[in-house]
């Protein structure tokens, strides 16, 4: 599989004559590096450190690495494993003094066609760069970066972009100037892929440069990349803007960066505007309060009104964070006058993703705006969203109720909440039903026991007989959480009787649900209720004509057994399990015998 270096010889490794085969596997691993079967080569590469340990540092350097360097035309999977292994190889070639021996194979890997392999090779090179001394870095690592940066293939030039920032800080001034020059030329490379790679590393590179170089070199590069003909390059420049903005003073920001950022927020490509919206909170923190008020707020208003739904949704997601990060003084006025009018429009947006994004954060504004504003301005919006035709919107409002509960109490909403909860609870999509069930214990806690018993209890019982198993299962767990919230006395009076009635249901699935409920309720309700109210029902169901029910009786007895006292176990449970242990159905027998042994009733 290789036309280059010979594989490391196996002779000296497997020394020790016929009797000693302890080193034999190494010989096999080395042979497998050349095997026709990809899987065997892959296994061998994954055990590369074992081979290197056996060969010792010198032979790893002189035989194994040249062999690996020459075999780099293999399946991508094998190359990926190799690139990963070599990143942790410094100790196996003799430590930092010899780290440069690992560069040739990784340099080859950094130029292959498959992106995943190149990225892994770059990651390993970045790791190894830290282990070079400054002298070795300039002698071995920097030349590698320069070779990649001026390579004929775009693959090598894209890989170079990820290596500048790790070798720059420790290089001499003359070499630093060369590194900056190479980075500059890659930012204006003819191939869009290379410019993309350079743009994606611009922020990272800016962080390791001297401030003067940031102003004189990075900012012009940022400006050019932000007006590149390819929108995929421009949107990466927006990401870099966050890092660059953190490095500059307010005056420099205003003069050097803001014109470009303003332009990006109005870019003709929606993907660039989307990126501005998506990075809005980071940009806001990076540019500070003054520029936020003068520049970012107007830009944000436009993004919330953007003609592209994706952009509006991304901006809507950021509403709460934007408001939280505004300086407290004057915050309320800005939100009420500049942000809230846009939000009101979004509540009735034509796109459900936009409405859903807004619904997931809008409740958080109540803590920022306080009680009176919430009641007067936000409450009508919440109520409108609770009536929205899209279930996701209603669900997002309901699942964020806790924010509002802290500010105005949930009573204000309870009359409108109820129809919304009922509709979601009966939604045709079972995942929507599932989501509302999972939120029920929190809702119950916020609305209180009277409201719950009057309005929501029947829903919780209805879910127990849903036609989707996942819903029945979630509804069962929901009961347990409710008992933990409202206490055992409530359970005994309200829940347990309703659950036990289902034991006589003609549908065997519903009879089984009774057992599942007892499994989770017994622990929450304790010994007395379990023994007096639940156990008799379980024992009676042992005579059910459906085998599925009978074996679930055995499982239930195993589950509630530890809660019961010894008398009940010996006198009531044991005879029933023994009878089930003789059942004609194999499964019933199996689970009954398992229960007998787990409960030590044999």
Curated annotation (Swiss-Prot):
Family: Belongs to the phosphatase 2A regulatory subunit A family.
Gene3D superfamilies attached to this UniProt entry: Leucine-rich Repeat Variant
Residues in HEAT repeats: 21-59, 60-97, 98-136, 137-174, 175-213, 214-252, 253-291, 292-334, 335-373, 374-412, 413-451, 452-490, 491-529, 530-568, 569-602
Family annotation (PROSITE patterns): HEAT_REPEAT
Oligomer status and interactors: PP2A exists in several trimeric forms, all of which consist of a core composed of a catalytic subunit associated with a 65 kDa regulatory subunit (PR65) (subunit A). The core complex associates with a third, variable subunit (subunit B), which confers distinct properties to the holoenzyme. Interacts with IPO9. Interacts with SGO1. Interacts with RAF1.
Gene it is expressed from: PPP2R1B
Species whose genome carries this gene: Sus scrofa (Pig)
Record's comment describing the protein's domains: Each HEAT repeat appears to consist of two alpha helices joined by a hydrophilic region, the intrarepeat loop. The repeat units may be arranged laterally to form a rod-like structure.
Annotated GO biological process: meiotic sister chromatid cohesion, centromeric; spindle assembly
Gene Ontology, cellular component aspect: cytoplasm; cytosol; nucleus; protein phosphatase type 2A complex
Keywords per UniProt: Repeat
PANTHER family: SERINE/THREONINE-PROTEIN PHOSPHATASE PP2A 65 KDA REGULATORY SUBUNIT, SERINE_THREONINE-PROTEIN PHOSPHATASE 2A 65 KDA REGULATORY SUBUNIT A BETA ISOFORM
Lineage top rank: taxon: Eukaryota
GO molecular function: protein phosphatase regulator activity
Protein name: Serine/threonine-protein phosphatase 2A 65 kDa regulatory subunit A beta isoform
Biological role: The PR65 subunit of protein phosphatase 2A serves as a scaffolding molecule to coordinate the assembly of the catalytic subunit and a variable regulatory B subunit.
InterPro entries assigned to the protein according to its UniProt record, in alphabetical order: ARM-like (IPR011989), ARM-type_fold (IPR016024), HEAT (IPR000357), HEAT_type_2 (IPR021133), PP2A/SF3B1-like_HEAT (IPR054573), PP2A_Regulatory_Subunit_A (IPR051023)
């Amino acid at each position: 599989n290789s036309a280059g270096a010979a594989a490391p010889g196996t002779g000296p490794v497997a020394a020790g004559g016929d009797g000693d085969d302890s080193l034999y596997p190494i010989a096999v691993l080395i042979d497998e590096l050349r095997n026709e079967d990809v899987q065997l080569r892959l296994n061998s590469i994954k055990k590369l450190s074992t081979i290197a340990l056996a060969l010792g540092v010198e032979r790893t350097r002189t035989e194994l690495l040249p062999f690996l360097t020459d075999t780099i035309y293999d399946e991508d999977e094998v190359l990926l494993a190799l690139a990963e292994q070599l990143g942790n190889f410094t100790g196996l070639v003799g430590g930092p003094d010899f780290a440069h021996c690992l560069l040739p194979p990784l340099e080859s890997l950094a130029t292959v066609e498959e992106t995943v392999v190149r990225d892994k090779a770059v990651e390993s090179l970045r790791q190894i760069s830290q282990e070079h001394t400054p002298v070795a870095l300039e002698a071995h690592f920097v030349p590698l970066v320069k070779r990649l940066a001026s390579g004929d293939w775009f693959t090598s030039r894209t890989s170079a972009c990820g290596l500048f920032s790790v070798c720059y800080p420790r290089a001499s001034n003359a070499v630093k100037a060369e590194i900056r020059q190479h980075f500059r030329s890659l930012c204006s490379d003819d191939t869009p892929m290379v410019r993309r790679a350079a743009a994606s590393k611009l922020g990272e590179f800016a962080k390791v440069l001297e401030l003067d170089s940031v102003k004189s070199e990075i900012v012009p590069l940022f400006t050019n990349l932000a007006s590149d003909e390819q929108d995929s390059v421009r949107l990466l420049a927006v990401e870099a803007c966050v890092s660059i903005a953190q490095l500059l003073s307010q005056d420099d920001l205003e003069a050097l960066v803001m014109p470009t950022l303003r332009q990006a927020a109005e870019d003709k490509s929606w993907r660039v505007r989307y990126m501005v919206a998506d990075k809005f909170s980071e940009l806001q923190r990076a540019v500070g309060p003054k520029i936020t008020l003068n520049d970012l707020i107007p830009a944000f208003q436009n993004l919330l009104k953007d003609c592209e739904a994706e952009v509006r949704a991304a901006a809507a997601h950021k509403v709460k964070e934007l408001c939280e990060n505004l300086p407290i003084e004057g915050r309320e006025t800005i939100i009420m006058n500049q942000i809230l009018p846009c939000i009101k429009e979004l509540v009735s947006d034509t796109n459900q993703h936009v409405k859903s994004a807004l619904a997931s954060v809008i409740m958080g504004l109540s803590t920022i705006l306080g009680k009176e504003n919430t009641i007067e301005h936000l409450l009508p919006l919440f109520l409108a969203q609770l009536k929205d035709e899209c279930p996701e919107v209603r669900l997002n409002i309901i699942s964020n109720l806790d924010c509002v509960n802290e500010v105005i109490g949930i009573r204000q909403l309870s009359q409108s909440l109820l129809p919304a909860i009922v509709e979601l609870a009966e939604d045709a999509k079972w995942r929507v039903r599932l989501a509302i069930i999972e939120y029920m214990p929190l809702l119950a806690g916020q609305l209180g026991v009277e409201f719950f018993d009057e309005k929501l209890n029947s829903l919780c019982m209805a879910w127990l007989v849903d036609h989707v198993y996942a819903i029945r299962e979630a509804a069962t767990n929901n009961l347990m959480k409710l008992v933990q919230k409202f206490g055992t006395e409530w359970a005994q009076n309200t829940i347990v009787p309703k659950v036990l009635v289902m034991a006589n249901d003609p549908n065997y699935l519903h009879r089984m649900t009774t057992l599942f409920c007892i499994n989770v309720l017994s622990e929450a309700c304790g010994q007395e209720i379990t023994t007096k109210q639940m156990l008799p029902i379980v024992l009676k169901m042992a005579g059910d004509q459906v085998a599925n029910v009978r074996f679930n009786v055995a499982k239930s007895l195993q589950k509630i057994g530890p809660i019961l006292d010894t008398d009940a176990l010996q006198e009531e449970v044991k005879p029933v399990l023994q009878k089930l242990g003789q059942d004609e159905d194999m499964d019933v027998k199996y689970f009954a015998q398992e229960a007998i042994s787990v409960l030590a009733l044999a």
